[in-house]
């Protein structure tokens, strides 16, 4: 079929239907979303969970969510900016950090569902493919599906690093090794050792050594945070090993500290909760209100409009002339 030019006439604009708002903004791929949220009809109201992975310039977000008519509901979430709590203070957006974030969200959701003791996941990380095996007596493994959004699903992408961390954490996510680092499409072979190096950040350590030998100024500029914290190339593997172990101990999220309201400034303080406002209005005052000593001045009454000075007009009637006889 040849090229057909679209005729934008009156009928075209009359029948035109705009796309969804998030499609117009380029935020949601509804073709993929429809297949991620539609549940089998014989499962009725059972939610279909998704592992949502989103990448930004400074953070990695992993969420467990399911769809409802009114909107998606987030069950559990983990962020890479929480990793300094577990010992990873720099490199919060690389492949190793994505693995740690996926591991963190997996341990949190299993702890929330009280499945963390039944499904410990893969404790010895080798980079090879790992599939969760269901226990004989007990509930099945938590199953969810990877949601990458609009990210490119290339081989070695960080979204698959987060998925690998979630799988090693004990979640049942259908996947293959074709998108992990170390897979060769030409030979159709998978190098698990290369994948392990990416999980423990050894590819960053090798680049640090190479850059330090070739260009020391570029090394100081690119790895300034590593240098300020005293982190060397030989320390990176142990940092991530300790982080994996510490994530499994307290995966729960720490309650954020509430800041005290400002005493003064441009913006007013926060509104008090209803209970405090109710008690404040019902409690008696410590002293009665004092009456004013001086009597307030009464407002001056205004005269009616027709009594005003300019309205008073003297009507002079013309005198009749004397009658002549």
From Swiss-Prot:
Source species, domain of life: Eukaryota
PANTHER family for this protein: LARGE RIBOSOMAL SUBUNIT PROTEIN UL18, RIBOSOMAL PROTEIN L5-RELATED
Organismal lineage: Eukaryota, Metazoa, Ecdysozoa, Arthropoda, Hexapoda
SUPFAM superfamilies assigned: Translational machinery components (SSF53137)
Keyword annotations: Cytoplasm, Nucleus, Ribonucleoprotein, Ribosomal protein, RNA-binding, rRNA-binding
Subunit (UniProt): Component of the large ribosomal subunit (LSU).
CDD domains: Ribosomal_L18_L5e (cd00432)
Protein's recorded name: Large ribosomal subunit protein uL18
GO MF annotations, alphabetized: 5S rRNA binding; structural constituent of ribosome
A Gene Ontology term for the protein's cellular component: nucleus
Family affiliation: Belongs to the universal ribosomal protein uL18 family.
Function: Component of the ribosome, a large ribonucleoprotein complex responsible for the synthesis of proteins in the cell. The small ribosomal subunit (SSU) binds messenger RNAs (mRNAs) and translates the encoded message by selecting cognate aminoacyl-transfer RNA (tRNA) molecules. The large subunit (LSU) contains the ribosomal catalytic site termed the peptidyl transferase center (PTC), which catalyzes the formation of peptide bonds, thereby polymerizing the amino acids delivered by tRNAs into a polypeptide chain.
Region Disordered, residue ranges: 247-300
Principal subcellular localisation of the protein: cytoplasm
Biased composition (Low complexity): 262-273, 282-291
Source organism of this protein record: Anopheles gambiae (African malaria mosquito)
């Amino acid at each position: 079929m040849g090229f057909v030019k679209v005729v934008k006439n009156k009928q075209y604009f009359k029948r035109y239907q705009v796309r969804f708002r998030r499609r117009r903004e380029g935020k949601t791929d509804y073709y993929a979303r429809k297949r991620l949220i539609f549940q089998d009809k014989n499962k009725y109201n059972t939610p279909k969970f998704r592992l949502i992975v989103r990448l930004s310039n400074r953070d990695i977000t992993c969420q467990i969510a399911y769809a409802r008519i009114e909107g998606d509901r987030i069950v559990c979430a983990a962020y890479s900016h929480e990793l300094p709590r577990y010992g990873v203070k720099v490199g919060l957006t690389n492949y190793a950090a994505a693995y740690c974030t996926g591991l963190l969200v997996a341990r949190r959701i299993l702890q929330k569902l009280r499945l963390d003791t039944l499904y410990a996941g893969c404790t010895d990380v080798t980079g090879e493919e790992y599939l969760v095996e269901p226990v004989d007596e007990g509930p099945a493994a938590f199953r969810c599906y990877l949601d990458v959004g609009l990210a490119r699903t290339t081989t070695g992408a960080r979204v698959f690093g987060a998925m690998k961390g979630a799988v090693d954490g004990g979640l049942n996510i259908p996947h293959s090794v074709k998108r992990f680092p170390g897979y060769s499409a030409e030979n159709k072979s998978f190098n698990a050792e290369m994948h392990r190096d990416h999980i423990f950040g050894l590819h960053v350590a090798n680049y640090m050594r190479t850059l330090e030998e070739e260009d020391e100024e570029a090394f100081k500029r690119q790895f300034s945070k590593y240098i300020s914290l005293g982190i060397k190339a030989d320390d990176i593997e142990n940092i991530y090993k300790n982080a994996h172990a510490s994530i499994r101990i307290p995966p729960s999220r720490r309650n954020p500290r509430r800041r005290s309201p400002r005493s003064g400034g441009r913006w007013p303080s926060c509104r008090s909760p209803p209970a405090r406002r109710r008690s404040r209005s019902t409690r008696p005052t410590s002293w009665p209100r004092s009456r004013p000593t001086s009597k307030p001045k009464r407002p001056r009454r205004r005269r009616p409009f027709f009594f005003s000075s300019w309205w008073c007009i003297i009507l002079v009637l013309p005198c009749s002339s004397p009658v002549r006889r």
